[in-house]
From Swiss-Prot:
Cleaved signal peptide residues: 1-21
Keywords of this entry: Signal
InterPro entries per the UniProt record, alphabetical: Uncharacterised_HI0310 (IPR020493)
Protein name per Swiss-Prot or TrEMBL: Uncharacterized protein HI_0310
Amino acid sequence: MKKITLFFTALLCLFSTSVLAESNSIPKQCEQLFKETENLIAQAEKQPGTHIQVNKIKSKLNQSKQQILQMELATQLKSCEVGLAKLSNLKSYSE
């Protein structure tokens, strides 16, 4: 449970930057990052006693997604690439 909370906290910190701009499509890297984080949330929901925390994490993650989607395309790409790299590092750390 601690590892899952640590992981999501790190992801939320990564996504906390907000740059306002418009984008019409979601970069492949961001789609992959969103899908992987949603899978991790689904796994976290299966853990006993995590429902309150998971709901908070879902809410913050949805806010972060919206922030990313408002960034310029180049910033979206960079943010999602960094997010995927950190996700990969956190996955290897938790194994």
